[in-house]
A protein has these predicted regions:
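Cytosolic regulatory modules rich in charged/polar residues
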Residues: 1-97
Length: 97
């Protein structure tokens, strides 16, 4: 299975899914100034977020998404856990008087 719900809003994804596929499944938008990442593989994209070879449990945040390396083999990312965090626009509601 390449996209597995783990509960608590977290999903384990294969590193060979594209960023666009994962963002679609998570109902997230890729920022307009970063559209070139849409066709990158998740593993390649995640690697670029680190300034070192990542280890399991290393994580980074990207525009409302927390990403954790969950499985590696010989410096290759195999699985990632994606956890969408609250989007700012979702917390604004209810102000109408």
């Amino acid at each position: 299975e390449s996209f597995v719900p783990l509960g608590g809003g977290r999903y384990e994804v294969d590193a060979d899914l594209t960023v666009g596929e994962v963002f679609d499944k998570l109902d997230l938008e890729i920022p307009d100034d970063d559209e070139n990442i849409e066709h990158k593989l998740m593993g390649e994209w995640a690697y670029e977020q680190f300034d070192h070879i990542p280890s399991e449990r290393d994580q980074f945040a990207y525009d409302g998404l927390e990403v954790t390396v969950s499985k590696m083999r010989q410096h290759r990312i195999l699985k990632l856990v994606c956890h969408p965090t609250a989007k700012p626009e979702e917390t604004k509601g209810g102000d109408e008087a």
